[in-house]
Swiss-Prot record:
Cofactor binding mode and count: Binds 1 zinc ion per subunit.
Species for this entry: Salmonella choleraesuis (strain SC-B67)
Residue numbers binding ATP: 240
CDD domains: GluRS_core
Signal peptide: none
Subunit description: Monomer.
Biological process (GO), any one: glutamyl-tRNA aminoacylation
Protein name: Glutamate--tRNA ligase
Cofactors (names): Zn(2+)
Keywords, sorted A to Z: Aminoacyl-tRNA synthetase, ATP-binding, Cytoplasm, Ligase, Metal-binding, Nucleotide-binding, Protein biosynthesis, Zinc
Ranges spanned by the short sequence motif 'HIGH' region, renumbered to the chain: 9-19
Gene transcribed to yield this protein: gltX
HAMAP family (UniProt xref): Glu_tRNA_synth_type1 (MF_00022)
Length: 471
């Protein structure tokens, strides 16, 4: 049997981390078994579905590089197929037309709730032989079995049983002729030959209804696996107050897709004590049997740690391709300065996100208008004038511009003036970067370049001279 899974989001909002984890698990399961992964857009909610949400879902899947083998399929383009199946069910007697008014259904609901009963349709039209005109408004309901039970072996949770007496006669076509979500899902899974449905635990109650419809159609029933919810680190359902919940928001915040995927795969699944997984390792090791039944807690600090790890372990050239977007967001012109791959090497240890990296690299490419006030007050004092003059001259004399030779120039200045490296290094750092913090000074000065570094030292000397004149 060829394994076939699907990810079927509703385009009523962005791709959130819970949906992304479900997509990842479905994708990994298919890849592990050499099967196929289908992308299906469940856009039957015409009022809430938007083109922007569809685009956001596709953007998120593409950014995570969860490539699909079929699709994307859109349910709104399959209404003719759904209605044809409903008509067949009406002919076969496995579905029936219901003419009950909203007022009657509301009254029935109130009466049942007053008795402490679970609200459900009472089957009035199922057993009615009353004649109705063809143009009289009605819905179509599925004639759910009235006895027995539905048992399915959840691939994560084990056997789950529902009594058919607990299940309603589900509406499968509305009065406007549009098919409903639960019915469309069934026909799609049947037509697309889905073998394994991996989805959130909030769909468990839909499963017995969908199984009964599949059996009524004499269609094969797929295996089901329901993944637990994701909570915030406070144990409450994950929401915006816990931080970003949109996949693309994590992109915007400077996370690498490898970091988010690695974090999401471990959010409910494990393989021993291993924490870091390449995509290939995920595919090789993933199994539904190792997915936890318990809810997972989202820990932003752990994700940040993973992101920092990947910034420093993936090829700098690759990280630079993702950094480019953030550089553009900051409107930094990188034509005059180090290559972005070199920048990744320079700032990787200091920066935990690519956004942070982009926001802290401007001095490598553009001159700054003023020095950081606190850093200048502390380090650009009259006592720093001589060290800056000497190191400027030694840097000017370098013919082979390299980080090693920059280091020698700084060390030679300290030796000549018989002062500690800090007496030379800190004023020099503020002079060339405008701030009191940077990567190692030799590689920083080298990356900024000889001409620009000397110009900035002269600017700092001018700042010191002006400061002296005001005393």
């Amino acid at each position: 049997m060829k394994i076939k899974t699907r990810f079927a989001p509703s385009p009523t909002g962005y791709l959130h981390v819970g949906g992304a984890r479900t997509a990842l698990y479905s994708w990994l399961f298919a890849r592990h078994h050499g099967g196929e992964f289908v992308l299906r857009i469940e856009d039957t909610d015409l009022e809430r579905s938007t083109p922007e949400a569809i685009e956001a879902i596709m953007d998120g899947m593409n950014w995570l590089n969860l490539e699909w083998d079929e699709g994307p399929y859109f349910q709104t383009k399959r209404f003719e197929r759904y209605n044809a199946v409903i008509d067949e069910m009406l002919e076969a007697g496995t579905a029936y037309k219901c003419y009950c008014s909203k007022e009657r259904l509301e009254q029935l609901r109130e009466e049942q709730m007053a008795k402490g009963e679970k609200p459900r349709y009472d089957g009035r039209c199922r057993h009615s032989h009353e004649h109705h005109d063809d143009d009289e408004p009605c819905v179509v309901r599925f004639a759910n079995p009235q006895d027995g039970s539905v048992i399915f072996d959840d691939q994560i949770r084990g056997p789950i049983e529902f009594s058919n007496q607990e299940l309603d006669d589900l509406i499968i076509r509305r009065t406007d002729g549009s098919p409903t979500y639960n019915f469309c899902v069934v026909v799609d899974d049947w037509d697309m030959e889905i073998t394994h449905v991996i989805r959130g635990e909030d769909h468990i109650n839909n499963t017995p209804r969908q199984i009964n419809i599949l059996k009524a159609l004499n269609a094969p029933v797929p295996m089901y696996a329901h993944v637990s919810m994701i909570n915030g680190d406070d144990g409450k359902k994950l929401s915006k107050r816990h931080g970003a919940v949109s996949v693309m928001q994590y992109r915007d915040d400077g996370y690498l897709p490898e970091a988010l995927l690695n974090y999401l795969v471990r959010l409910g699944w494990s393989s021993g004590d291993q924490e870091i997984f390449t995509r290939e390792e995920m595919i090789k090791l993933f199994s539904l049997g190792a997915v936890s039944k318990s809810a997972s807690a989202f820990n932003t600090d752990k994700l940040l740690w993973l992101n920092h790890h990947y910034i420093n372990t993936l090829a700098p050239e690759y990280v630079a391709t993702h950094l480019q977007w953030h550089i553009e967001q900051e409107n930094i012109d990188t034509r005059n300065g180090p290559q972005l791959a070199e920048l990744v090497k320079l700032l990787g240890e200091r920066c935990k996100t690519l956004k942070e990296m982009a926001q802290s690299c401007r001095y490598f490419y553009e001159d700054f208008s003023e020095f950081d006030a606190d850093a200048a007050k502390k380090h650009l004092r009259p006592v720093a004038r001589q060290p800056l003059e000497v190191v400027r001259d030694k840097l000017s004399a370098i013919t082979d511009w390299s980080a090693e030779n920059v280091h020698h120039a700084i060390q030679a200045t300290a030796d000549e003036l018989e002062v500690g490296m800090g007496k030379v290094g800190m004023p020099l750092r503020v002079a060339v970067t405008g701030a009191g913090q940077s990567p190692a000074l030799d590689v920083t000065v080298h990356a900024i370049g000889k001409t620009r570094s000397i110009e900035r030292i002269n600017k700092a000397l001018g700042f010191i001279a002006e400061r002296e004149s005001q005393q």
